Amino acid sequence: MKFNPFLEAIKTYESGKDMDLVAKEYGLKEVIKLASNENPYGTSKKAKEAIINNAHLAHLYPDDTMSELKQALAQKYDILKENLIIGSGSDQIIEYIVHAKLDHSKAYLQCGVSFAMYEIYAKQLGVKVYKTPSLTHDLNELYELYQKHKNEIKVIFLCLPNNPLGECLDASAVFEFLEKIDEDCLVAIDGAYNEFASFKDSKKHINPKELIHKFQNAVYLGTFSKLYGLGGMRVGYGIACKEIINAFYKLRAPFNVTNLSLKAAVAALDDDEFVQKTLENNFSQMKLYEDFAKNYKIRYIPSYTNFITYFFDEKNSTDLSEKLLKNGIIIRNLQSYGLNAVRISIGTEYENSRFFEEFSKNF
Amino acid sequence: MKFNPFLEAIKTYESGKDMDLVAKEYGLKEVIKLASNENPYGTSKKAKEAIINNAHLAHLYPDDTMSELKQALAQKYDILKENLIIGSGSDQIIEYIVHAKLDHSKAYLQCGVSFAMYEIYAKQLGVKVYKTPSLTHDLNELYELYQKHKNEIKVIFLCLPNNPLGECLDASAVFEFLEKIDEDCLVAIDGAYNEFASFKDSKKHINPKELIHKFQNAVYLGTFSKLYGLGGMRVGYGIACKEIINAFYKLRAPFNVTNLSLKAAVAALDDDEFVQKTLENNFSQMKLYEDFAKNYKIRYIPSYTNFITYFFDEKNSTDLSEKLLKNGIIIRNLQSYGLNAVRISIGTEYENSRFFEEFSKNF
């Protein structure tokens, strides 16, 4: 059977290892996963209750207007419901961006190393990718490339803070950059971890309302998968002017988010205590990872997220990840990003102590 | 801002009315929804328990290999896990079919009136649609159109039984038809309601194993949204030879199904009692709808599904649907399919009695 030729260029995405499968494979009693930047404090109590209280409604199709969650997000950000689209994770909004603006004759721009899904979706359409020489976000380099290829570049992805490297631009610098970009180029501000950055340093805070009111060509991406502890429920969102939201809506399949996910997300937004605890613990535990790296003379970039990335000079990140895996610690090897580095999600105090223990033994 | 030109041709999908919103709008205490073919007996006890017992894991990304659910489905159908792909509803598998095989230079074929999502996905790519003159499946007409346009037609959708009309072809006739279709044309057998048809008449039963072993160009679609009572959880699947599954996998975004949906689906497969009760009650209640139609001299097609479609000669289906809506009964008006007809999901005994009551008053 012949398939559309563009499929040939697509590699099938291979996901990280599941904890249960790792436990079985290596005969382990305990497996600690510090690989997917999930919330180490679990699901918020309110979100869990919302799921349990609505489990008996699992037979009913979701409210496809998603009005309850849109109302809650509109209130949080002081925007209109018409400025919102909800996706199966913010990944799905990335997919809409790529499909609405790009094709094989166009290009998108990102820094040297950023979230893998931008490129995965772009390659599905044969879209060209421009990356800056610097791995982290450098606005001068980004602007230089944009200027040189502005006829092709119709989307720019800025990941603030950046996954998998952890650095973050100041909001003021981003707004200045946006002033220089043509109105026909869509600029996506991926704020999947922006709450973490904002907590550490308010200068990093992107205000979606201000963003979309100043720039008709900007879209802000948010998610419930990280701070809000709902990685398994697949809920993210895009915030933009109505014109952009309407275009994305044309690409959305009906019922793209489950009814329990919608209920859980509404409840999670209301759980301030859980959010505060997560943010505070994250950065107090992050300090331990920084101190640990200094002790072992490991290079790292100060992180504005819920993970930290260690770079190696002599040791091989693949060997190290595999050794840790066999001892029940899953971290993310970054060789697939072309880096001899690992990304470690900041876990609970206990999980982190286990990481330090196993890492010390195997480093 | 300019978007890709193909977006202009796409109409935004408008979903059915949500019960809570209808209740608010019309100030109703009770709203009965017989519009989306959901399971009127709710969520199976086992599935509900699986959701409740796993709610505390909502922060963890789903196992993207989906091995537990694939194992359960492989066992149910006596096939390999490699013959399976899981989607966010079987809708998502329809999307993969369209995107893997079709573009603006190709066409797909269906009977006169069938599931709306085939055409919605096809239009996103500017794909041509051929429909038979007959509203219901007529294999001779389908074959005639196929023969005439076989250079263009690269996908055929057969909906067995057919949504929204309810009729169903015999499996033996479908297999004979498949013998005559070229290997490069993908034939999708949409079995979303096939369990209902098989229960009523075993001649309607499509055996996915037999189908894919005989035909390398066939894909079977199944869902957990109807019989298995998980419409809100968005789980469906495709069964085909490995070559087709591999092509679809290239189009799949990671984590396309929530972790609680996977757990619920595994549990639902194991709840035979719930499934049996649903099937038995469905057809005993269906009989009441047939008798009711005969009394009122309303035309209907004998249904092999969990819904029945009433056709009107003089009354207008839009007026009637609106009258019922104001009285708290939501049914599906089929004017958008070009039919002066309504589709009514078979509900519980009480729900159906309320439908008969309000229908009698307003007809």
Swiss-Prot record, chains A, B:
Q: Which residues form a coiled coil?
A: none
Q: Which residues carry this modification: N6-(pyridoxal phosphate)lysine?
A: K226
Query: MF terms per GO, please?
Result: histidinol-phosphate transaminase activity; pyridoxal phosphate binding
Asked if the keyword Transferase belongs to this entry, the reply reads: yes
Q: Please verify whether the record's keywords include Transferase.
A: yes
The family database entries (SUPFAM superfamilies) matched by this protein are listed as: PLP-dependent transferases (SSF53383)
UniProt cross-references to InterPro entries, sorted A to Z: Aminotransferase_I/II_large (IPR004839), HisP_aminotrans (IPR005861), HistidinolP_aminotransfase (IPR050106), PyrdxlP-dep_Trfase (IPR015424), PyrdxlP-dep_Trfase_major (IPR015421), PyrdxlP-dep_Trfase_small (IPR015422)
Names of required cofactors: pyridoxal 5'-phosphate
Tell me which Pfam families the record gives: Aminotran_1_2 (PF00155)
Q: Which pathway does it serve?
A: Amino-acid biosynthesis; L-histidine biosynthesis; L-histidine from 5-phospho-alpha-D-ribose 1-diphosphate: step 7/9
Q: Report the EC number(s), separated by commas if there are several.
A: 2.6.1.9
Query: What catalytic activity does the UniProt entry give for this protein?
Result: L-histidinol phosphate + 2-oxoglutarate = 3-(imidazol-4-yl)-2-oxopropyl phosphate + L-glutamate
Catalytic EC class: transferase
Q: Which UniProt keywords apply?
A: Amino-acid biosynthesis, Aminotransferase, Histidine biosynthesis, Pyridoxal phosphate, Transferase
One GO BP on record is: L-histidine biosynthetic process
Quaternary assembly: Homodimer.
PANTHER family noted in UniProt: HISTIDINOL-PHOSPHATE AMINOTRANSFERASE, HISTIDINOL-PHOSPHATE AMINOTRANSFERASE 2
The family assignment reads: Belongs to the class-II pyridoxal-phosphate-dependent aminotransferase family. Histidinol-phosphate aminotransferase subfamily.
User: What is the official name of this protein in its record?
Assistant: Histidinol-phosphate aminotransferase
